[in-house]
Design a protein with these regions (language model features):
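N-terminal glycine-rich beta->alpha transition that marks the start or flank
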Residues: 29
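Rhodanese-like catalytic fold shared by cysteine-dependent sulfurtransferases
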Residues: 2-18, 22-25, 33-65, 74-106
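Short, surface-exposed ligand- or partner-binding patches at beta-edge/loop junctions that are enriched
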Residues: 69
Length: 106
């Protein structure tokens, strides 16, 4: 990874497209339940960062493709690191819903 790759911000819109193409993938919203209720990307599962260890309830297989987002990208970056430490091998930090241009559910 180059220095410039590190600076590149995840693109939530591209990440959602990749999620939609991935068979058996899980879209994780790691914001608080209150934030999730205020509007979330359709089909996403709410597993707040503080309870990320409960991810096994939605992704039992460690090879499951996980697409992780939050509000701005900071918590999703942290959650992605934690998921990798837990042994998940296909973790994708897609950034923050603040940049999302698609439909949201409430």
């Amino acid at each position: 990874m180059s220095f410039f790759d590190f600076l590149k911000q995840p693109d939530v819109n591209q990440g959602v497209k990749e999620y939609q193409r991935a068979s058996g993938a899980v879209l994780l919203d790691v914001r608080t339940p209150e934030e999730y209720r205020s509007g979330h990307i359709p089909e996403s599962k709410n597993i707040p960062l503080q309870t990320i260890d409960r991810v096994g309830s939605v992704a039992k297989n460690k090879d499951t493709a996980l697409y992780v987002y939050c509000q701005s990208g900071a918590r999703s970056r942290q959650a992605a690191g934690m998921l990798k430490q837990m042994g998940y091998t296909n973790v994708n930090n897609i950034g923050g819903i603040a940049a999302y241009v698609g439909k949201v559910e409430r």
